[in-house]
Amino acid sequence: MLVWLAEHLVKYYSGFNVFSYLTFRAIVSLLTALFISLWMGPRMIARLQKLSFGQVVRNDGPESHFSKRGTPTMGGIMILTAIVISVLLWAYPSNPYVWCVLVVLIGYGIIGFVDDYRKVVRKDTKGLIARWKYFWMSVIALGVAFALYLVGKDTPATQLVVPFFKDVMPQLGLFYILLSYFVIVGTGNAVNLTDGLDGLAIMPTVFVAAGFALVAWATGNMNFANYLHIPYLRHAGELVIVCTAIVGAGLGFLWFNTYPAQVFMGDVGSLALGGALGIIAVLLRQEFLLVIMGGVFVVETLSVILQVGSFKLRGQRIFRMAPIHHHYELKGWPEPRVIVRFWIISLMLVLIGLATLKVR
């Protein structure tokens, strides 16, 4: 929005030309989202407390979590608000990739909001019925994937980028829709599963978004894309603005979500952020890179799948509790230790993922 305004004002004052620089807009996008999130935090927490929108804690969870009962939840609303406002201010409104991310972000946020509302208002620990949650998540993911396929059919936008192999970029055809669906829905659920400890999900989300900001910048720059042997996508550059907005909003939220948390993001935050990371990976053609950089989310999800599968097939559990962060809690690790170690692992995986772009 401000970019368009600056384009009209630059003829009166050349200084407005700074708004055309992607790096400048990326920085101010981060700062805008950060300040909005910090400003909204105390007000959102007070409002949630007044409405008695407190966290519902399962009785079969770790005993250390019982003290979290009643902590305000649905704080993801302030994350999404900060991201959307920042993106609308600093990204080019005509960019289709930006709107794809916003559709998934807001759509998944609405699904998460309904889920949270049922939990905190109706006191239903199960929230939105699973089949309806997956149905609406699938509708959004398939709708966006199908639209992208129609527009990008038989172009680099529907190729599969394989790490370590610079000349292996097969056209996916209709499989593009299926892959995109699983990436978007899967990442949404993976971040949702990871959001079980104070600050555990938000910091890896920030790390991955920061990593994708660098990838988006390279993908939208023809020279760097050719140098790294990745597809050049002319709309990809504006995703830098989206990614830095996620970073800023996430850091602002972490101010209030760090241990001991004053507020939880709820499904309205975790589903939306996960879906956003998924669609960003799809748009950048970096689904494999998401698996590497988002390794913490992958492991958390696999721990649940293995736990459920093992119990159904053998009647035995592999972990003391799943997702795996609860396993370490029950082993006696203090919650802050689990959180920070997972953060360290996440940062390492993002750096490893970025390194794979050059190792080809």
Swiss-Prot record:
Transmembrane domains' residue ranges? 26-46, 72-92, 94-114, 132-152, 168-188, 199-219, 236-256, 263-283, 288-308, 338-358
The UniProt record lists the EC number as 2.7.8.13
Cysteines paired by S-S bonds: none
Q: Which residues lie on this side of the membrane: Cytoplasmic?
A: 47-71, 115-131, 189-198, 257-262, 309-337
Keywords, comma-separated and alphabetical = Cell cycle, Cell division, Cell inner membrane, Cell membrane, Cell shape, Cell wall biogenesis/degradation, Magnesium, Membrane, Metal-binding, Peptidoglycan synthesis, Transferase, Transmembrane, Transmembrane helix
The cofactors it requires, by name, are: Mg(2+)
Q: Which GO annotations describe the biological process of this protein?
A: cell division; cell wall organization; peptidoglycan biosynthetic process; regulation of cell shape
Q: Gene Ontology cellular component?
A: plasma membrane
Pfam family of this protein, just one? Glycos_transf_4
Name the chemical reaction catalysed here: UDP-N-acetyl-alpha-D-muramoyl-L-alanyl-gamma-D-glutamyl-meso-2,6-diaminopimeloyl-D-alanyl-D-alanine + di-trans,octa-cis-undecaprenyl phosphate = di-trans,octa-cis-undecaprenyl diphospho-N-acetyl-alpha-D-muramoyl-L-alanyl-D-glutamyl-meso-2,6-diaminopimeloyl-D-alanyl-D-alanine + UMP
Q: In which pathway does it act?
A: Cell wall biogenesis; peptidoglycan biosynthesis
Give an example GO molecular function. Answer: phospho-N-acetylmuramoyl-pentapeptide-transferase activity
Q: Which parts of the sequence lie on the Periplasmic side of the lipid bilayer?
A: 1-25, 93, 153-167, 220-235, 284-287, 359-360
Topology relative to the membrane, per the entry? Multi-pass membrane protein
Q: What subcellular compartments does it reside in?
A: Cell inner membrane
NCBIfam families (alphabetical): mraY (TIGR00445)
Please report which protein family the annotation says this sequence is part of: Belongs to the glycosyltransferase 4 family. MraY subfamily.
What is the designated name of this protein? Phospho-N-acetylmuramoyl-pentapeptide-transferase
What species does this protein belong to? Salmonella arizonae (strain ATCC BAA-731 / CDC346-86 / RSK2980)
Underlying gene: mraY
